[in-house]
């Protein structure tokens, strides 16, 4: 097993995502940010994230952390899934709930997949978190993606305190797995 890196280059141009990941990983590992425009393949979230990690590691020539997020609607056989970004750009959070207007089932699953890649030529390691909820009309601040229309136990992500959200969110769950993995590398 390779040693734990001194820092990780988190590849994202999303300042809200960066702040959330920094908050969750605070005190665990130094997180640096790189905003690289990566080609994003179409496929499963695992395939997309793995490919992004390989491309980013090649570009950075060192250890990277990348992330891909899905929002899956049971009534639509898990669509939009990894393509949620494009739905959000077209509809926005205020209109997202209309996608399920013709369905009784409003259940949704938020899925976050991180990939760590040690560097060029190394196989990425995946860490995935999932949170079950439902799609609702937008409530709360709309500054962070679909947080205002994804409800977990009566509150949208946007209505939650950030530290509370980070404990139960798909991203928080995935990063807990990453933290456990990093701790095992230190202990090895």
Swiss-Prot record:
The lineage of its organism: Eukaryota, Fungi, Dikarya, Ascomycota, Pezizomycotina. One of its GO terms (biological process) is nucleotide metabolic process. Pfam families: Ham1p_like (PF01725). Binds 1 divalent metal cation per subunit; can use either Mg(2+) or Mn(2+). This is Inosine triphosphate pyrophosphatase. GO terms for molecular function: dITP diphosphatase activity; ITP diphosphatase activity; metal ion binding; nucleoside triphosphate diphosphatase activity; nucleotide binding; XTP diphosphatase activity. The keyword Cytoplasm applies. GO terms for cellular component: cytoplasm; nucleus. Pyrophosphatase that hydrolyzes non-canonical purine nucleotides such as inosine triphosphate (ITP), deoxyinosine triphosphate (dITP) or xanthosine 5'-triphosphate (XTP) to their respective monophosphate derivatives. The enzyme does not distinguish between the deoxy- and ribose forms. Probably excludes non-canonical purines from RNA and DNA precursor pools, thus preventing their incorporation into RNA and DNA and avoiding chromosomal lesions. Transmembrane segments: none annotated. It catalyses: ITP + H2O = IMP + diphosphate + H(+); dITP + H2O = dIMP + diphosphate + H(+); XTP + H2O = XMP + diphosphate + H(+). HAMAP family: HAM1_NTPase. Its main location: cytoplasm. ITP binds at residues 12-17, 52, 68-69, 85, 144-147, 165, 170-171. Its cofactor is Mg(2+); Mn(2+). It is found in: Cytoplasm; Nucleus. It comes from the Eukaryota. Homodimer.
